[in-house]
């Protein structure tokens, strides 16, 4: 008769804890968290938002089955010089953003910190332009300040 995989008995607790501690490292999410890989490769370096300068406007084609060009901007972050692509939400709001504008970006809110919906490779979205909320400019409540 073959033996059991796990120890059992009154004093098996220590052995069970040691086994659990060892086999936890086979879990990808645990390993990434413990080794700090998310912060290590994160352009925002763990911060919720970041300031950046708009380098260019780009159109990103939506994934199947949708056919659209999602309006995005390439942004160079002030804090570390990394260049990321950020989605511009709201209809026609790309018209309020020019090159060399200062924008604030945040995570787009996709699953596991990744891209959202049908926009491939875009993990961030624009929330402010030159210190004013993009939504306020778009809805006509405020005017975009000229730098």
Curated annotation (Swiss-Prot):
Annotated Gene3D superfamilies: Nucleic acid-binding proteins
GO biological process entries: translation
Domain of life: Archaea
Cited InterPro entries: NA-bd_OB-fold (IPR012340), Ribosomal_uS12 (IPR006032), Ribosomal_uS12_arc (IPR022863), Ribosomal_uS12_euk/arc (IPR005680)
GO MF term list: rRNA binding; structural constituent of ribosome
SUPFAM superfamilies for this protein: Nucleic acid-binding proteins
This protein's UniProt keywords: Ribonucleoprotein, Ribosomal protein, RNA-binding, rRNA-binding
CDD domains: Ribosomal_S23
Family the UniProt entry places it in: Belongs to the universal ribosomal protein uS12 family.
Protein name, per record: Small ribosomal subunit protein uS12
Organism: Pyrobaculum arsenaticum (strain DSM 13514 / JCM 11321 / PZ6)
């Amino acid at each position: 008769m073959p033996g059991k995989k796990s120890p059992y008995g009154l004093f098996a607790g220590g052995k069970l804890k040691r086994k659990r501690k060892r086999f936890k490292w086979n879990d990808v999410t645990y390993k990434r968290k413990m080794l700090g890989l998310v912060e290590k490769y994160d352009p925002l370096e763990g911060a919720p938002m970041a300031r950046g300068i708009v380098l260019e406007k780009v159109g990103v084609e939506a994934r199947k089955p949708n056919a659209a060009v999602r309006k995005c901007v390439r942004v160079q972050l002030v804090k570390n010089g990394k260049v990321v692509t950020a989605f511009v939400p709201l209809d026609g709001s790309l018209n309020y953003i020019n090159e060399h504008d200062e924008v604030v970006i945040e995570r787009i809110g996709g699953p596991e910190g990744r891209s959202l919906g049908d926009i491939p490779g875009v993990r961030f979205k624009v929330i402010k332009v030159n210190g004013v909320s993009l939504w306020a400019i778009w809805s006509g409540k405020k005017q975009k300040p000229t730098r």
